[in-house]
């Protein structure tokens, strides 16, 4: 999962040998530089540690550091789901979490859950009620339909962003790519 998320962040990176530092677009609010979505403006300590490893030629260690960071950064998704029984849904949510943050991921999930369990507050905080609704939805066993709903809400989220005119085409492509990968796991 983590390797796929890193590839979605930088399609030229396929593993340790191709791991690189890239300049962010001027309109990106993550800073000036990134390593597969790990930005100097958002995670400076992690970025600097990984860059130091790359500068020292420790590419394998830098790659492992990136993978572990993605897993640690998105671990809340596994806690929401409660098990590894729904890898496609877990992947899709982890990818969005890494790309857009916990609150935005919580909101798209809650919008999907509210569709089936009306009355859920959409605040981006996955608390006991959201988890109960999620577990109920997952117990129905239709992960592909749930993924369809998540994809729809993720695309709607991207379209609502102020920076959609600048980054929207790439965001929607990533959403589609993540959806395809998630379906292969479901």
Tell where the protein language model's regions lie, with residue ranges:
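Cell-wall polysaccharide-cleaving catalytic domain and substrate-binding groove, primarily
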Residues: 1-186
